[in-house]
């Protein structure tokens, strides 16, 4: 969608009327108005995946309506997400939104996507951040859950929500479909090191907590970015991050100057290029940045209490201890 800045009678540019998240600036936000094209593809069973080529999410077809996961990253992409679902399910409105975590680029624009949804379900940790933030366009949760696991039965669809502990963002929740044997999670595992530079990756706990999901029975992983992965590709991402952390520690031991990125990059290539460089998506762009991020973590001690919450090495098992029914 093209964006045109309208001018008021006084000659000054009018402020864009789209939802603005927490961007507190005067003038239009053209990036938020842009409406990227969307691709909708079947996954397994009742589940579909929708992507703009970078961001990816799920929609679950119910008997009478649609259960949508997240809202996409901007007002424009949220509107396109809505249109994609309307095109594929013209007689089934979105009645439920499930939030994976609090970040605005995934759950920030429900007001543009499905303002009339009957319910928005989120982990209580996610819901608390959203309520306190009061971001323009991010709708508050109407139903919350707590703990690690919740079986969900909504409108004929059944799946499980799993909060493995602190990983990235707040309350980041995986969706597990035991009958279809696949898993979805936003912003933790995907091909390459692309976005793990985002500040609130909790380096102490995110790898052991996310690894717990390997205890479940699944062979397909749908990430919140880029393309689907096999179970082996999911495991390979941890190998990359274990090597990244080890490289950062070795760099500190070797006296590499944390303030000299050229030296950090040189050290990263010496240690990681041979095993990972040619087979890792966007390695050249992000590998050294992530080594630097780990170095800062080790040097500063991390994110305080958030980075030192207890975590578990106990794998999840395919059991369903708690159930959430739906009034729908």
From Swiss-Prot:
Q: Which residues are trimmed away as propeptide when the chain matures?
A: 1-9
UniProt keyword Hydrolase present: yes
Where is Zn(2+) 1 bound in this sequence? Answer: 101, 103, 168
Which InterPro entries would you find in this protein's record? Answer: Metallo-B-lactamas, NDM-1-like, RibonucZ/Hydroxyglut_hydro
* EC code(s) of this entry: 3.3.2.14
Q: List keywords of the entry alphabetically.
A: Hydrolase, Metal-binding, Zinc
Look at the named UniProt entry and state the broad enzyme category this protein falls under. hydrolase
GO MF terms held by the record: ether hydrolase activity; zinc ion binding
How many cofactors are bound and how?
Binds 2 Zn(2+) ions per subunit.
Catalyses which reaction?
2,4-dinitroanisole + H2O = 2,4-dinitrophenol + methanol + H(+)
SUPFAM superfamilies to which the protein is assigned, alphabetical: Metallo-hydrolase/oxidoreductase
**Induction info:** Constitutively expressed.
Cofactor(s) it depends on: Zn(2+)
For binding Zn(2+) 2, which residues are annotated in this chain's numbering? 105, 225, 247
Q: What does this protein do?
A: Involved in the degradation of 2,4-dinitroanisole (DNAN), an insensitive munition ingredient used in explosive formulations as a replacement for 2,4,6-trinitrotoluene (TNT). Catalyzes the removal of the methyl group from 2,4-dinitroanisole (DNAN) to yield 2,4-dinitrophenol (2,4-DNP) and methanol.
**Subunit and interaction comment:** Part of the complex DnhAB composed of the 2,4-dinitroanisole O-demethylase alpha (DnhA) and beta (DnhB) subunits.
Q: Which family does it belong to?
A: Belongs to the metallo-beta-lactamase superfamily.
Note, other: Unlike other known O-demethylases, it does not require oxygen or electron donors.
Name of the protein: 2,4-dinitroanisole O-demethylase subunit alpha
**To which species is this protein native?**
Nocardioides sp. (strain JS1661)
> Which gene codes for it?
dnhA
């Amino acid at each position: 969608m093209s964006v045109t800045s309208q001018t008021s009678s006084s000659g000054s540019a009018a402020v864009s009327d789209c939802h603005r998240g927490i961007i507190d600036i005067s003038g239009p936000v053209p990036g938020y108005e842009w409406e990227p094209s969307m691709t909708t593809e079947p996954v397994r069973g009742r589940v579909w995946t929708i992507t703009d080529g970078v961001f990816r999410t799920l929609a679950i077809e119910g008997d009478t309506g649609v259960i949508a996961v997240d809202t996409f990253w901007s007002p424009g992409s949220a509107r396109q997400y809505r249109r994609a679902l309307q095109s594929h399910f013209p007689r089934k409105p979105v009645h439920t939104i499930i939030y994976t975590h609090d970040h605005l680029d995934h759950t920030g624009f429900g007001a543009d996507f499905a303002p009339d949804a009957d319910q928005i379900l989120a982990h209580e940790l996610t819901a608390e951040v959203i309520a306190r933030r009061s971001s323009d366009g991010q709708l508050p949760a109407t139903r919350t859950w707590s703990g690690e696991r919740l079986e969900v039965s909504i409108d004929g669809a059944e799946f499980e929500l799993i909060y493995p502990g602190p990983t990235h963002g707040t309350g980041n929740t995986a969706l597990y479909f035991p009958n279809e044997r696949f898993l979805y999670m936003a912003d933790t595992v995907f091909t390459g090191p692309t976005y793990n530079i985002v500040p609130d990756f909790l380096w102490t706990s995110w790898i052991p907590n996310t690894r717990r999901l390997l205890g479940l029975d699944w062979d397909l992983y749908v990430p919140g970015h880029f393309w689907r992965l096999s179970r082996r590709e999911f495991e390979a991402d941890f190998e990359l991050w274990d090597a990244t952390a080890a490289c950062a520690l070795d760099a500190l031991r070797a006296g590499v100057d944390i303030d000299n990125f050229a030296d950090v990059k040189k050290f990263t290539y010496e240690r990681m290029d041979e095993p990972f460089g040619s087979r890792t998506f966007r390695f050249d762009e992000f590998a050294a940045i992530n080594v630097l991020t780990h170095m800062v973590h080790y040097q500063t001690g991390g994110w305080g209490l958030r980075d030192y919450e207890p975590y578990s090495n106990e794998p999840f098992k395919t059991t369903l201890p708690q159930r959430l029914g739906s009034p729908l």
